[in-house]
């Protein structure tokens, strides 16, 4: 139906006859000459119809926005005065000699202009129109280039693309599963995979050595800007490779991706222990573009007559920390400080103490703060020295339980970086390593930091003796404060796997019921293996500069995990429910389509 794409035409096509197909982006009637901007996925070209072609001109006069056209004409150079430098095809136009209206279009509910202020709910309701916008077209085309480049890299490095099951069984991986009732197995359910984790490990046991998959995964969890109930991850697993080797081959892929697609070259990516990330940046995914650090001052305030500091300073589970903002005296108003005090309250902080350094040589009168009178002069001097304060700086303080201070000041650090535009680079990748194996839950038990298949850096006996001290052989790749993904060396010994299950409170009976197939596989000569997974949606979101992963997914769900275009999830008829042996409990007469039904057997 066509000979060229609209956006692919250029001066080399002058005097050639072409046939184009596309949508009407804009139509203009200038003194008896009709101009139509015809759009396809490659771009826009101007088509001209004049009264000399009587039938075509009459037809062009009927054309409206978003009509679908087929146009035949001759490419010609534009007059110098009409060249449009803002269009890739701005030097040429097509003089139309034939026109066919392939389909008409109703008036669209919102303009497709890139700068149109359209609510996201409307965009998602008419996603098939929203996807026509240049921004969305560019995002999805770029996403395709990313997946193609990843496949090419992994293929070259000997990885095999293997699909794993979508219908599987529920396993504890940290989030709620999406369950699928079985019609043929009364009372039983499949689960949609949160990741291909166990299957890719089994492929290593089976001897496939290097596996990858662009995998669809599902998690029934609360949504944020960078979360979706169904998402895509770049899943990788290898055998007979050390942690450093796995990280190196992955880093090579990451660096090649940015160089080839964005002309950005990264130096070797820094490795940072988890403990340093938490201590200095208040996060296990620190944004290294921000030149602010948390500084612990607990030892300096243990004996002060100021309970706000002294209490946490003498509590082994608490933390007293300073965060210096260079030049903060002039940059931050009292109202902003009050706003930041409210902000840290989101993370459980009871307040936000601060000191303004007006003259550090005068420790009596040169410091401005509601709390400074509670700190002896030697303590003031020690704090200024430790944080490296200069005149004009402002120092924030956090004093509370370790988790509260870490999260509150870590978040404040990121907010200050954004609000004051403190970024020192456009991109800052980082490997975070040496994670703890476990963390304590609210009931005093242990939960896995990553997942229960991560290998520790110690023996099973040492692990059981002191779970809280054990470090894992895990690693996360962080970019600009966003966790792109992570992985670990896996457990390949049945004894070690059973030791981890025991620490997590999984009984031998439950181990056999839920993980018997894995324990069996590990007992039949499982090789040392490890891998990782990247969130493709998050990666593309960062690379194109989108504010949400919904802008890099063709048909995403809303913040409430619904599709407003198809009204999914929806109700099903009684016959289907009976076939699945399901009865709805507390069913409403008119249940909104976006509400998930509550299942009861």
Swiss-Prot record:
Annotated site (Important for tRNA non-discrimination): 30
Subcellular location, principal: cytoplasm
Biological processes annotated in GO: aspartyl-tRNA aminoacylation
PROSITE patterns: AA_TRNA_LIGASE_II
Compartmental location: Cytoplasm
SUPFAM superfamilies linked: Class II aaRS and biotin synthetases (SSF55681), GAD domain-like (SSF55261), Nucleic acid-binding proteins (SSF50249)
Keyword hit for Cytoplasm: yes
GO CC annotation: cytoplasm
Assembly description: Homodimer.
Family annotation (NCBIfam families): aspS_bact (TIGR00459), PRK00476.1 (NF001750)
Descriptive protein name: Aspartate--tRNA(Asp/Asn) ligase
Organism: Cellvibrio japonicus (strain Ueda107)
Designated gene of the protein: aspS
